[in-house]
Amino acid sequence: MNVSQSAFVTREKITLKCVGIVTKPDSPEAAQFSKQLSCWLHDRDIATGINDIEEHMDLIIALGGDGTLLHIAELATKYSIPVLGVNFGSLGFLAEVNKDDTFESIEKIIAEETIIENRQMIRSRVLSKNSSSGYRFALNEVVITKNALDRLLHLSTKVNDQLLTDYRADGLIFSTPTGSTAYNLSAGGPLVYPGLATILVTPICPFMLSSRPLILPAEKLIKTKFKARDNKEAAQVLVDGQSLWKMHNGDELEIETAGHALKLIVSDSHNYFSILRNKLHWGVEDKRDK
């Protein structure tokens, strides 16, 4: 797979003729705001589509948290449509625009060049003895995991057809730098600056304490073979939190960097390290200790 060498940060003049608005499910606030936003755009002769992503759209506005943005990342990347995340959730690593700043942010997009961070995506598929699944794309991570009551998984993992190791663990997380602040971090993996081209491999509760997270170059092809103890044992594969496939004995999960990146719109004042401090409470004294 040829890894795209495009710059992490680019500037682009976006002409808005049609905008897709995607709302957080079961959020009356986001649904109501989408109507207000749609009217505002119509007043400026800009067509809109609600909760529908089409190839001809010039911009997608995700009204929700990071989960909403993850939900639309695959299609947005496929059609190379820039995404603006408006935070209606709680964390907001990716959806950094506040609701009250939405209209001002769109006016800047209309009037000026837009700053875009090209966020690396990874793609995955499951290879069985006589077939293979189609590719699916992730902005955060692909996870192979066991069922709650099952024993540890035996996962024989290769990098560019060279044996890495045989993991015995509850599962493995294959993460992008963007996803390093998500499940990877909870499992003890490292934080990685989103502009670096890497794939992170992080074991989940490994049997051997010497099994540690690993950072690989983005151009590496990773294959993990599931070695089940019997025909009843199975593993689950989740792509950005969505359960997609079940793996059986001898099946392989293939992971590699996707050929295209997600175009994530950021503000002039965007500061990755400030986001880490604020969201992870770095250097903030815990008032509960007083």
UniProtKB/Swiss-Prot annotation:
SUPFAM superfamilies in the record: NAD kinase/diacylglycerol kinase-like
Superkingdom: Bacteria
Catalytic reactions on record: NAD(+) + ATP = ADP + NADP(+) + H(+)
UniProt-annotated binding residues for NAD(+): 66-67, 71, 140-141, 151, 168, 170, 181-186, 242
GO biological process: NAD metabolic process; NADP biosynthetic process
A GO-annotated cellular component: cytoplasm
Pfam families to which the protein is assigned, alphabetical: NAD_kinase, NAD_kinase_C
Active-site residues from the entry: D66
Cofactor: a divalent metal cation
Signal peptide coordinates: none
The enzyme's E.C. designation: 2.7.1.23
Acyltransferase among keywords: no
GO molecular function: ATP binding; metal ion binding; NAD binding; NAD+ kinase activity
UniProt keyword terms in alphabetical order: ATP-binding, Cytoplasm, Kinase, NAD, NADP, Nucleotide-binding, Transferase
Localization, UniProt: Cytoplasm
InterPro entries attached to this UniProt entry: ATP-NAD_kinase_N, ATP-NAD_kinase_PpnK-typ_C, NAD/diacylglycerol_kinase_sf, NADK
Family to which this protein belongs: Belongs to the NAD kinase family.
Role: Involved in the regulation of the intracellular balance of NAD and NADP, and is a key enzyme in the biosynthesis of NADP. Catalyzes specifically the phosphorylation on 2'-hydroxyl of the adenosine moiety of NAD to yield NADP.
Record-given protein name: NAD kinase
Organism for this UniProt entry: Desulfotalea psychrophila (strain LSv54 / DSM 12343)
